[in-house]
C-alpha cells in the first residue's frame, strides 16, 4: 500500500492524557518523517465539539453516563475521516485499534477481537457496519501491544516508548470532570434519600452522580455501604440502597447498530449472546429480544449489576470472538433484589 499519515486535530484546549495535544501532532509528524511518508493534518475541531463534547455535557445534564471515546470513533474516525479519505481517493483508513476484521464462511465481514486480550478495542469500535468495515484496516490487531512496541523500537520511532493515552482527551487529569463540567453548566444540588423516601444526605452537583456510585453523597459514616440505585433528574433526587439493589434481570438497549443486517433475523431464532458494557469489562451471557431494528431487551442468565443509562452495550457471538451489534443502555426492565 501507498501510505499517508493523518492526524486529526480535534480538541482545541490543553490535554494531559496522551491524546489530542499539540505535542501529539508533532510526534505524528516526526514519525511520518522517519518513515518517509507524507503527513496531513485535518482540523475537525468543530465536528468534535458538535458530536462529542457538547453531547457529553448534555448527557450529564440529562442524568446519563456517556462514553465520549465511542462517540469520537463513531462521528470522527469512522465518519468524517473516512469521508475525507474517500474524497481524496484513498482505498482505506487504517487505525491503530486493537481489533481485527475477518470474513466468515458466508462472506460477511466480522469485527473480531484483537489478539491482545488485555488491549482489545472491539468494544469502542463496535459501530462499524459492513460498508465501514470494507473501508477500514486494523494493521496491529493481530499483534500484542508489546509486539507493536518492539517493532517501533526496531524502526527507531520516537514514540516507541510513549505511554498509552489514558482517559478522555478533553478532561484534564488535574481539573477532572468536575472542573470541566463546572465551567460549562450550572450544577444543581440534589437530595439523597433512602428507598423509603427518608432523607439520607445531599450533593451539590446532581450532574456528577451516576448509578452505582458510593462516595461523595454526603452520607453519615459508620453505617453499611450505600450505593446510588436511582437518579431522578427532573426532581433532583438521588436514591441510595445496599449493593443488592443494584442488580437487575434485564436491560433495554436502543440506538442499536448491527454489524450485519443478517444478524437481526438470526438473533430472532438463536438469541444467545455475550454482552460487554465497558471497555475492559467481562462479556456476560444473556438472551436477546429484538423489539425493533433499533431497540432490544437483554435478559441476563444471572442477575447483573445495573448498567448506567447512557453507557454503550455491545453484543458478541457466543464464542466471544466477534461483534454482532451495539447500542446505548436506556433502562432496566426488571430490577431484582438479592437480599
Residue ranges of predicted features:
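AMP-forming adenylation/ATP pyrophosphatase catalytic core
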Residues: 1, 12, 94-101, 108-339
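ATP-dependent adenylation/nucleotidyltransferase module used to activate substrates
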Residues: 1-126, 137, 145-147, 228, ...
Amino acid at each position: 500500500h501507498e501510505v499517508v499519515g493523518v492526524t486529526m486535530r480535534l480538541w482545541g484546549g490543553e490535554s494531559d492524557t496522551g491524546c489530542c495535544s499539540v505535542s501529539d501532532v508533532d510526534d505524528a509528524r516526526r514519525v511520518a518523517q522517519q518513515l518517509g511518508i507524507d503527513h496531513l493534518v485535518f482540523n475537525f475541531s468543530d465536528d468534535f465539539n458538535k458530536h462529542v463534547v457538547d453531547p457529553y455535557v448534555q448527557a450529564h445534564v440529562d442524568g446519563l453516563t456517556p462514553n465520549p471515546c465511542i462517540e469520537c470513533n463513531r462521528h470522527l474516525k469512522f465518519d468524517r475521516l473516512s469521508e475525507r479519505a474517500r474524497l481524496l481517493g484513498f482505498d482505506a483508513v487504517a487505525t491503530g485499534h486493537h481489533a481485527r476484521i475477518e470474513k466468515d464462511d458466508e462472506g460477511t465481514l466480522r469485527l473480531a477481537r484483537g489478539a491482545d486480550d488485555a488491549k482489545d478495542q472491539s468494544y469502542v469500535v463496535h459501530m462499524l457496519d459492513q460498508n465501514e468495515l470494507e473501508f477500514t484496516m486494523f494493521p496491529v490487531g493481530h499483534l500484542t501491544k508489546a509486539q507493536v512496541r518492539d517493532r517501533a523500537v526496531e524502526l527507531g520511532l520516537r514514540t516507541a516508548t510513549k505511554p498509552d493515552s489514558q482517559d478522555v482527551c478533553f478532561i484534564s487529569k488535574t481539573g477532572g470532570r468536575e472542573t470541566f463540567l463546572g465551567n460549562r453548566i450550572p450544577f444543581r444540588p440534589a437530595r439523597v434519600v433512602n428507598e423509603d423516601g427518608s432523607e439520607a444526605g445531599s450533593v451539590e452537583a446532581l450532574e456528577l452522580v451516576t448509578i452505582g456510585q458510593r462516595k461523595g453523597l454526603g452520607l453519615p459514616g459508620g453505617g453499611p455501604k450505600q450505593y446510588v440505585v436511582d437518579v431522578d433528574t427532573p426532581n433532583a433526587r438521588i436514591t441510595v440502597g445496599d449493593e443488592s439493589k443494584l442488580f437487575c434481570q434485564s436491560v433495554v438497549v436502543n440506538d442499536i447498530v448491527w454489524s450485519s443486517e443478517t444478524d437481526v433475523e438470526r438473533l430472532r431464532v438463536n438469541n444467545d449472546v455475550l454482552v460487554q458494557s465497558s471497555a475492559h469489562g467481562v462479556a456476560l451471557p444473556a438472551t436477546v429480544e429484538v423489539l425493533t431494528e433499533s431497540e432490544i431487551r437483554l435478559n441476563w442468565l444471572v442477575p447483573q449489576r445495573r448498567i448506567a443509562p447512557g453507557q454503550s452495550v455491545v453484543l458478541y457471538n457466543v464464542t466471544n470472538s466477534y461483534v454482532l451489534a451495539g447500542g446505548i443502555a436506556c433502562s432496566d426492565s426488571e430490577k431484582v433484589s438479592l437480599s
